[in-house]
Regions:
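Hydrophobic core segments within long, regular secondary-structure runs in both alpha-
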Residues: 84-91, 135, 139, 185-196
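Helix-turn-helix
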Residues: 11, 15, 19-64
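Hydrophobic alpha-helical connector segments
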Residues: 60, 74-107, 154-164, 188
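Amphipathic alpha-helical segments used for helix-helix packing
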Residues: 100-128
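Short, flexible helix-adjacent loops and helix caps
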Residues: 25-29, 74-81, 99, 143-150, ...
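Hydrophobic/aromatic-rich alpha-helical bundle segments in the mid-to-C-terminal region
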Residues: 5, 124-128, 132, 146-195, ...
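Hydrophobic/aromatic residues within well-ordered alpha-helical segments
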Residues: 12, 54, 61, 65, ...
């Protein structure tokens, strides 16, 4: 069956994103548009036509990528659920994702993406915007939860989300690299230790 124009465009976008992931994963900041286009079976002109340029393709690639330490798949908690319970579930999920056999390869890809972004200020700016958007999604898990007899606000949830992501990313990378053999209990208790007024800030 012949593809419609929209279907063909979507298929070409998918091919370029997957090709970019492979080339960036292998070459990092040395990744070339020509290599990406060739692997996708397209031309560099297609990249400019579909994405506007290399940086927009790279951002699309990162947005499409599901990190082994990404928590967006966790459904938002029911309003009023104890914050400690939600944070505990996040920590457990983080540990399971970090212990996944594919996590090492995905961590290497993330390192290549950082190499790419740190060598391109424009791309770095776009990736930072994407990171901030992801933080807001993550914070939605905690907003509306109950803590200390009050409801966690959006601002408090965002502060906690940033602190948790930093803490659990570090612990998770240790698991991926085999540097630590930590228990679920340790992950949970360490994560819950961040639930303080000083971290959450004012309501």
């Amino acid at each position: 069956m012949r593809l419609t124009r929209a279907e063909s465009k979507a298929a070409n976008k998918r091919a370029l994103i997957e090709a970019a992931r492979e080339v960036v994963g292998r070459e990092g900041s040395k990744a070339k548009l020509e290599d990406i286009a060739e692997l996708a079976g397209l031309t560099t002109g297609a990249i400019y036509s579909l994405f506007g340029g290399k940086n927009d393709l790279m951002v699309a690639m990162v947005d499409d990528y599901t990190s082994p330490l990404d928590l967006r798949s966790i459904e938002a908690a029911e309003p009023g659920m104890p914050l400690e319970e939600v944070v505990a579930e996040v920590a457990r999920r983080f540990l399971r994702m970090s212990a996944d056999p594919q996590a090492a390869g995905k961590l290497l890809f993330e390192t290549r993406v950082l190499d790419l972004a740190l060598n391109d200020p424009e791309l770095l700016g776009k990736l930072n915007a994407s990171i901030r958007s992801t933080e807001v999604d993550f914070a939605a898990l905690f907003s509306g939860c109950e803590y200390g007899g009050a409801t966690v606000t959006d601002g408090q949830a965002l502060r906690l989300a940033r602190a948790l992501k930093a803490l659990l990313s570090g612990l998770g990378q240790g698991v991926v690299l085999g540097a630590h053999d930590v228990s679920e209990e340790f992950f949970v208790e360490t994560a819950q230790a961040l639930i303080t007024r000083r971290v959450l800030g004012l309501a």
